[in-house]
Amino acid sequence: MGQFEQLDQLLETQDGMLRTAQVVSAGISKPVFYDYVHSRELERVAHGIYLSKDAWVDAMYLLHLRVEQAVFSHETALFFHDLTDREPLEYTVTVKTGYNPSKLKAEGVQVFTIKAELHGVGLTTAQTPFGHTVPVYDLERTICDLLRSRNNMEMQTFQGALKMYARRKDKDLRTLMRYAGMFRVEKILRQYLELSLIHISEPTRQAEIS
């Protein structure tokens, strides 16, 4: 099998997307790959990432490939966790403090920054509508993020997410209170939890804080 045929197969298995690093790992040199890109008229959509003309673009996965430290958060995390009925009009991610978000912001991505030691708190993964795995914050981290940014989002979205979380059987109040302490939103969280009709007894609260 020739190298172009090998690349054709790889392109098919990767749903029309190829990455330079992936191709090199498969034993194909960059010059050969670039000849292939020109021959097959692949589109360069980001550094080291190429798409075929008929590829369905998974924008969330592409964003993840471009900026690996970007974690889907806030309203976008609500979408992944079924805490909103609306698909996000723009993606929201969180990156470590020090990363320059100007390019992402110019593309319409809402970017939050957080110090490095808190960036990985609540980090998990989820599947995009196209079936790709991307990083996203868990339910409890998402609630804390919403509390921290509540003045920058629609009150209806914020309150709706809290009410839906309150009804979730998989909610973890102990973890939620632990995160709230780390992000310094514990006091305001208790107020909103009470409004959402979640009643935590005082002994349980003390156990969750400790």
Predicted regions and their residues:
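Short alpha-helical segments that sit at the start of domains
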Residues: 1-5
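Nucleic-acid-binding surface
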Residues: 6, 15-22, 26, 32, ...
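Glycine-centered, phosphate/nucleic-acid-interacting loop/turn motifs that mediate DNA/RNA or nucleotide
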Residues: 40
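Single conserved hydrophobic/aromatic residue that forms the stacking wall/gate
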Residues: 198-210
